[in-house]
Amino acid sequence: MKKQLLLSAVITAFAVPVGARADTPEYRLVLQNHRFVPDEVTVPAGKRLKLVIENRDPTPEEFDSYDLRREKVITGSSKGEVWVGPLDPGSYRFIGEYHAETAKGRLIAK
């Protein structure tokens, strides 16, 4: 019985995502017609944050940012999450790699 309780406690401890706190800022981006809306988002510098990207297009898109060192494929008509930061003050570009001519934007950390 004690082993089962210990095992349950260990599994529960690792099941909670790191950084999933109520005070973690969350920002939403929508991909529609192969464009990010909004295409510019101001975020707090020095904080870890979550980007929730909703792809309203029927085709997949890859959120890609060399500046943020992140990439994530988001299938059509679905959502994805990207965790970034803490960020230094500055501008961080991102694109939708499959439609880079139109799907582009930036985070501005202040």
What would you call each of these model-derived segments?
Residues 1-7:
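Bacterial N-terminal signal peptides that target proteins for export
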Residues 18-22:
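Sec/Tat signal peptide C-region and signal peptidase I cleavage site
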Residues 39-41, 69-73, 83:
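Beta-strand-rich interaction surfaces with strong enrichment in secreted/lumenal proteins
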Residues 49, 59-61, 103:
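Short beta-strand/loop motifs in extracellular/secreted proteins, especially
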Residues 53-55:
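Asparagine-centered strand-capping/turn motif at beta-strand->loop junctions
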